From Swiss-Prot:
UniProt similarity note: Belongs to the TRAFAC class OBG-HflX-like GTPase superfamily. OBG GTPase family.
One example of a Gene Ontology biological process annotation: ribosome biogenesis
Positions contributing to GTP binding: 166-173, 191-195, 213-216, 293-296, 324-326
Enzyme class, UniProt record, top EC level: hydrolase
OBG-type G domain residues: 160-343
Subunit structure: Monomer.
Official protein name in the record: GTPase Obg
Name of the gene: obg
GO terms for cellular component: cytoplasm
Length: 357
């Protein structure tokens, strides 16, 4: 299924039914009073988060959603039936934006979350409400109110604990295959990953978390070059970023960057940080660990020496790991450390909730 993470839809709530002008007509009661009933309320439009959906692709085919109109009131004080609500299912992680005001009106983060996006109109009053001491036979009723109508932009932000950053072809998809049951496409050319992939990492029987691989970033991404920037929103909810670097990328005898992804390891780090700073600086404030991949492409001592030299040159103070995603060597300690971090984050969050009461 094609991955779609943006959609624009129109939602139209039902109008309220009109109130009725009617008079009681019974045998031997020639001058019965008003008995016109009220109109039914119009149906509303709701969004509901559904864990069984993972893309907004359905909204490419259906973009207008209408709730039912309320039924008009009738004689004998009969109220009109309310219009049926329109329920629209969306994936968990959907952000709802009012296009007219550019205001975020909802964030669907849990299965079953409901959001009212267009309220149905109230039913009109029948003429029985307008009877008075000076007007015993009112011939007036109130029409139903108009239902709300909005144009909404839906943005899907995947709910993942770990997000992977890196230039194309550094091995992010291979890493996800190594640590989870996900099977993203892997090949030796850039942009193999065209859409985000999610993998579930199981540490123990009841301990697991989700890792997301998004298309690789390239230099100039903040200006719209490449694929990765349009998917950066999926990393905004993550608790940890893994910044993957191809440690095997080296220069030839003339200093030209030839091998690997086309950038020396230190350039892979610095250029990506520049792109993040330009597009979404908040991502740089998240915990970010360096994962030096493709250590299997050189002798172990050489890989270790290159890694230590890189860390020293970067003055890197956060955790870092030397791994081979292909052979899975060194990948599992990262996952265990990540689980420890998440448990600590939960404990801190729980303490903050208690202290704020």
């Amino acid at each position: 299924m094609k991955f779609v993470d943006e959609a624009e839809i129109q939602v139209i709530a039902g109008n309220g039914g009109d109130g009725c002008v009617s008079f009681r007509r019974e045998k031997f009661i020639p001058l019965g009073g008003p008995d016109g009933g009220d109109g039914g309320d119009g149906g509303s439009v709701w969004l509901v988060a559904d864990e069984n959906l993972n893309t907004l692709v359905d909204f490419r085919h259906e973009r207008i959603f209408k709730a039912q109109r309320g039924v008009n009131g009738m004689g004998q004080q009969m109220y009109g039936k309310a219009g049926q609500d329109k329920i629209i299912s969306v994936p968990i992680g959907t952000v709802v934006i009012n296009v007219q005001t550019d205001e975020v009106i909802g964030d669907m983060v849990r299965h079953g979350d409901r959001l009212l996006v267009a309220k149905g109109g109230t039913g009109g009053l029948g003429n029985m409400h307008f009877k008075s001491s000076i007007n015993r036979a009112p011939r007036q009723a109130r029409p139903g109110e108009q239902g709300e109508e909005r144009t909404l932009k839906l943005e899907l932000k995947l709910l993942a604990d770990i997000g992977m950053l890196g230039f194309p072809n550094v091995g992010k998809s291979t890493f996800i295959r190594a640590v989870s049951a996900a099977t993203p496409k892997v090949a030796d050319y850039p942009f193999t990953t065209l859409y985000p992939n999610l993998g579930v990492v199981k540490i123990e029987a009841y301990s697991s978390f989700v890792i997301a691989d998004v298309p690789g970033l390239i230099e100039g991404a903040a200006d719209g070059v490449g694929l990765g920037m349009q998917f950066l929103r999926h990393l905004q909810r993550t608790k940890l970023l893994l910044h993957m670097v191809d440690i095997s990328a080296t220069a030839d005898a003339y200093g030209n960057e030839k091998v690997g992804v086309g950038l020396l390891p230190i350039e892979q780090v610095r250029k990506l940080e520049i792109e993040l700073e330009r597009h979404d600086p908040a991502l740089l404030d998240k915990p970010r660990w360096l994962v030096l991949n493709k250590a299997d492409l050189m002798p172990q001592e050489e890989a270790q020496a290159l890694a230590e030299a890189l860390i020293a040159e970067l003055r890197w103070t956060a955790p870092w790991y030397l791994v081979s995603a292909v052979s899975r060597e060194g990948t599992w300690p990262i996952m265990k450390s990540a689980m420890t971090l998440f448990e600590h984050q939960r404990e801190v969050a729980a303490e903050q909730r208690v202290s704020s009461r």
